[in-house]
């Protein structure tokens, strides 16, 4: 596959949208069934990803946000992490997209930013997840859905222990510029992205477009490409 980094600051790259809603309409439960579908019904996952390709996206994002050891252990699937990783990347690679990104979300473990043991435990979650994808055909990792700078820092450190691939990092930001945890600002997350070697600085917001553009300009102060995600809330006046 082409080196995605050669396209940074040159091309506008569009990432695929989450396929979980598509799978949910087919009867899959979002909590656990997505991993099941990846293994047992890969055709359903491939069909959902194919819809994104038909829409013209350049980057297919694997349905792997919940594939950290702690989250898989909660579903009794921790030992199947390597198998799940291979299946997820295979589903995307079969469609021959321009690029494949592996998504990892927050690991879900409690995090005490003042405790070295807690930080190491969280960091290890992401390192172990990244190791499961070693040797597979991917162009980078996508750290998505993070709500605190400390959690994001652990994720970045964990990935950098294992991989030199590009890392897209994204945090959830409110209209007021605060992260979803309500205690830290977007600027703190950007500082962490710069310090811990993110390749792309990103955010996801439900804010109006004008406010989202302000967040994008804030992120653009870093010497990194900017990833903007708009979380469009369903409008049902009834």
What function would you assign to each model-found segment?
Residues 1-238:
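Domain-level signal for soluble alpha/beta catalytic cores
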